Amino acid sequence: SDKTIPFIAWGYHPLWHGTLFREELTELFPDQPVMLWHRSFHELIVNDAALNLLEVTEADLVGHPLTNWAKGHFYENGMYALIPKMPFIFDPARFGKGMQNFIQMVHQGGVTTALDMGTGVFGNPDAEINLIRHTVESSQAPARIILTPIITDFISRKRTIEQAVQQIDKWRDESSHRVKFDRRFKLMIDGAIYSGLAQFKFPGYIDGHEGVWMVSKEVTQRWAQAFWDAGYQLHAHTNGDGSAEVLIDLLKTL
C-alpha cells in the first residue's frame, strides 16, 4: 500500500511466470510502483508508476544500451540507469533486517566466514559497507564477512583504475576483525546464465541471440593487469565456455 517506494518482487523468470514487461505490469498495477527483480538478479522490469516514482525518463537511457524503454527492461550494466535512483535499498531498517536474517542463517549453519563477491553492485559502496559493518559488528554471531570490490561498480561510477586502487586501500585500512577487505578484486566477464546472457562458443543459443560482455576484453585486461601487479587475488564471474576461454587467455598474459 506504500506508494512512496516500489513493490519489489524477486525471482521472476519467464520460463515459469510467462512474459511480463512494462505494458503488462502497468495493466496489472496502474497506480502501484512495481519492480520485478529477475531470478538471475541481473535484470529489472518496471511499470509506468515505478518509472514515474524514480523520475526516470527515456533521455536518461542515453549511453545505457542494455535497456529497453518501451519494455521497462533494464539488464546487466543497463541496471545502473536505475540503481542510483533507488536509495530506499539502503534504508537502515530494511537493509538491516535483511542483514540480520543473513547473519542468523550464517550462525545456524555454523559458518564462520562469508564472502560478499560483489560489494558495490548497488552503486553506493560506502553506504553498503557501513550498513554491513553496523549489523555484523553488533551481532553476537561468531562470524566475519570478507568484502570483495567489483569492477563494474567502479566503471559505472566512472572511476579510473588508480582511483579504484586508492579507494580499496582506504577500505582495507578501515577493516575490522568482523568486516574486512583484503587483496581481492572481482572481474565480470559475461552475463547471467539464468538470463540467457552468458557467452557461448559454437553452436551458441539455438534461437541465434548472443550473450553480453559485461566489460570489454580490452578494459578487463587493463584492470586485471593493474590489480594483479598490485598483488591482488583475482576472482571472475564467468558462465559460458566462450567467456571461460577469454578468462583463461587473459590469465595467461598476467
Describe the function of each predicted region.
Residues 1-166, 183, 187-243:
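Divalent metal-binding segments
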Residues 226, 249-253:
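Conserved helix-loop functional segments at active or binding sites
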Residues 171-176:
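Accessory "access/gating" subregions that flank catalytic or transport cores
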Residues 178-180:
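Short, conserved active-site loop motifs that form the nucleotide-linked donor/cofactor pocket
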